[in-house]
Amino acid sequence: MDFLFVQFHSTIKLNFKTHHGSFFYYVKEYRCMSKEKLEFVEPVDTNTDNEYSREPVPLGARKSCFSLTIVWTGFVFLVTSMMAGGGLAAGLTFNELLLAMILGNIFLCIIAGLVSVIAYKTGLTFALLTRYSFGQEGSRIASLFVPIVNLGWYTIQAALYGHFIAQVFNLSYTGEVIAMMLSAVIMGIFAVLGIKSLAVFGYIAIPSIVFLSLGTAARSVQTIGGWQELFNYVPLQPIDLLSGITIVIGTWILSTATCIADIMRYGKSKKDVITASTIGLLGGNTLMISCGAIAGVAMNDGDLINVLLSFGLVFPSLLLLTTNIFTTNGANLYSTSLNLANSFKLNRNMMLAVLIAISALATMTQPYKIDSLFVFLSTLGIIVPPLCGIILADFYLVHRGKYIDYHKATFKKWNLVPWITWAIALVCVKFIPFGLPSLNGIVSGALLYALITYIVKPNVVSESKG
């Protein structure tokens, strides 16, 4: 190991060069420069990957609450939430719909807040958090499930965007294929540039999304004859309130249970991450669902893009779809790359290049037309939630809300307890006759993991000496 000392005013910078790369350690300089007087602070990885995919985010790299709110809210803004609102409008009165939105999003906020606090306290990606419960090698397999789902939806949304461009500009089949492939590549650029680019794009995109969504909803209200008509609306095929709440929870349960950690690990305080996650869901998701519901009642179509097109507003519809999909898909692929960086020994940027290439090629199959692909991804959406329950139980119940520092932790290679828990939880989800499968998965995963760990006591992580 080579040592290089460089003095900077009141600090000394030590460059440790190893076969794993180059790492800088900052140490405080005292008047007496003996070894006993050097105090090590947090390490900063100086490799080309500046997104801390394999280590905690240092305090100096943490982001403001506003920046976190922008990135997370941009992630939450999605066309499918609008469509969910349109679906809710088909079965609930508007008063019931408002109640379902509030209760469903409050539950999502609780899950998001719990995961966000873990991410803030540790500074770790969701993939690295799994090491504390699954072990060093077990984590590599466990963290594969989330990116598979994310990459699938990333590809579908890139293909949908390319297809929309082809429809608007009347492109040929070849033109549509090129548009879909370019969509996958261009959206991926934001993931390559990292958390900063996602925040910058969010500053531009979010005001546009809010303005266009509210404007479209207001135009829809005018079409139906005013707000009174909206509140007097009676659905033709009523559903119960619990089903409505379940649908709202289903819009973002997967990402609030997993991907949010990859954003909130940049938080500076518990208050910041809870505030950011709450605004994104109670503000952003509620806006998308309610605007979709209003359009669903007035225009019989919860997709605001289609509503704008029906008004003959092609450019606004293109702008809304662009900002809507790009903010979500950029963060989607960003999270995917972080999870896969834990599973494979590849640089994050190299991993992103591979993912973008795979996605671009996959769009050629026009995945938005493949029903079996949606079934596959939906199935994985049921399989993944117990993983979140395991992480929550491991941190809050087993470790009493405090993990051993990642740099001082020594992990076992494997722990069978979470795998056994996961399998039993999936059986429970299969046979529980009520509620949302993903929600049931989180709850059963958490309870079972805590119980089995209490009995077995696997001792997955220990603090290294020296």
What are these regions (language model features)?
Residues G86-G91, S116-V117, L160-N170, S183-A205, ...:
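Membrane-water interface regions at transmembrane-helix termini and the short interhelical loops
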Residues C65-S81, A217-T223, Y233-A295, L309-G330, ...:
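Hydrophobic, membrane-embedded alpha-helices of multi-pass small-molecule transporters
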Residues M33-N95, I239-I247, R265-D272, V456-G466:
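Membrane-interface "cap" regions at the ends of multi-pass membrane proteins
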Residues V71-F75, S143-P147, A158, F169-L193, ...:
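Transmembrane alpha-helical segments of multi-pass small-molecule transport proteins
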Residues C388-G466:
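C-terminal membrane-solvent junction of multi-pass transporters and transport-like membrane proteins
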Residues G87-S116, G138-R140, L281-L282, S444:
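Extracellular loop-to-transmembrane helix junctions
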